[in-house]
Amino acid sequence: MWGLQPPTSIPPPPPPTELTPSTYPAMVNGYPPPAASAQSCSSSGGQSELYMPLQRVMAPTGGRNSIKYRDYTPCRNTTKLFYVDNKASDIDTYNKDANHSNFRTTVIHNQDLDADTAATESIQLDNRSCWGGDLKTAVRTNCPNVSSFFQSNSVRVRMMWKRDPPTSTAPPSAVGSGYSVPGAQYKWYDLTVPEGNYALCELIDLLNEGIVQLYLSEGRQNNVQKSDIGVKFDTRNFGLLRDPVTGLVTPGTYVYKGYHPDIVLLPGCAIDFTYSRLSLLLGIGKREPYSKGFVITYEDLQGGDIPALLDLDSVDVNDADGEVIELDNAAPLLHDSAGVSYNVIYDQVTGKPVTAYRSWMLAYNVPNSQANQTTLLTVPDMAGGIGAMYTSLPDTFIAPTGFKEDNTTNLCPVVGMNLFPTYNKIYYQAASTYVQRLENSCQSATAAFNRFPENEILKQAPPMNVSSVCDNQPAVVQQGVLPVKSSLPGLQRVLITDDQRRPIPYVYKSIATVQPTVLSSATLQ
């Protein structure tokens, strides 16, 4: 009997084998199929209305990319989570004692829910998939370059605080054999500069004013003379116009032009940058930056003796131009017009008169000197030498490799990193010395920053034409994809720390977005 067979384009199921039974049950998305099973199809002659593929083929579908929130329709494939630091509802509820770098915020922005209710909600990512989140952060800062928080407003200095009374108040009349002060006693002081955002020349003025204040507060009352002030910050090159025969600076004055920050020391004095970033602002670094301690002493400046000035009254000029002098009559200038000594002594190596002051700049430029081997001349970093900025979202991301889950402030896993967004802006200002004189005359600043205008060593340091300022710029960083948790609580913690893992008080705006997406299956092998 010729009967019509039901048409079908579905291929027959694979024949069952008795030796290796199928390890995959005839299921679709975990439910029995509406059609006959493979066994019943084979027993009925292979006529099946629906071909059932193995469960592994159908497994990746069926909601494995769903993002669910409450009873709303699931969102497929991806979404975006927003982290904002100054939501009014969050401030009133969770962040009364927080700041922009350590706060909590709700990522559920449902206008029908208050902050308390939104914090109890959660966003569910299908746990059959491995999810990753693309993190993008944006931070704005208002950080000054001199602050106590970043250890850039103080430095330790060693100065004379006591000595025997001088036997005579008259200025010196002859070159000394060496620098020796009867009964001199030294001790360490903490030199602190007011916090602020300064240009380089302003910072040097404040440092020198701090040195004078230390002298006035204790040294002056204990017989310490002005010529015994043994720490000075300067910018000049004291070796310019030094006569190679006499060893004296022939004009009788040092060239009043700034080139690079410098440190001037007397015997027994020192400066300690161990716990200060001011060395970075001054452009004085370490050859071995990871070695412990950073102290510059007078002995470290071997070869940096500041040459003595030529006493113009001691020479007999015999030509019309006034450039040729009688060498036999050349003598060093022993004191300034106010009678303050220049501490002129004889160099033990050359026998020529020099001052007892030593300059770091001069010592650094002597080949193979100790200053050249242990320190490094760098561009002054007026950004404060601040390091890195770390972002942590402990309630969103799974701890990256190398971290463990922790919600402690200084132990939160790091999921984002970038340089601190302060930048050293270099500019050129022509005739900066003229501008300095104009400012001093108009603002009565001479008494504050140029207390010893007659003394060529202690006078105000000239500004540099090439100088620097600190500038804060927004930092927008694409941090990349990291694994996120499958259950995201509505209340999230955001933490932005410095390289010591402390919340940064100078962050005044921080926002972030996380875009989750499926990376792989969490159930398939």
Curated annotation (Swiss-Prot):
Q: Name one GO molecular function term.
A: structural molecule activity
- This chain belongs to the protein called Penton protein
List the gene name: L2
Highest taxon, organism lineage:
Viruses
Entry's localization field: Virion; Host nucleus
Species the sequence originates in:
Fowl adenovirus C serotype 10 (strain SA2)
Give one Pfam hit by family name. Adeno_Penton_B
Indicate the family of this protein.
Belongs to the adenoviridae penton family.
Query: What does its record list under induction?
Result: Expressed in the late phase of the viral replicative cycle.
- InterPro entries assigned to the protein according to its UniProt record, in alphabetical order: Adeno_Penton_B
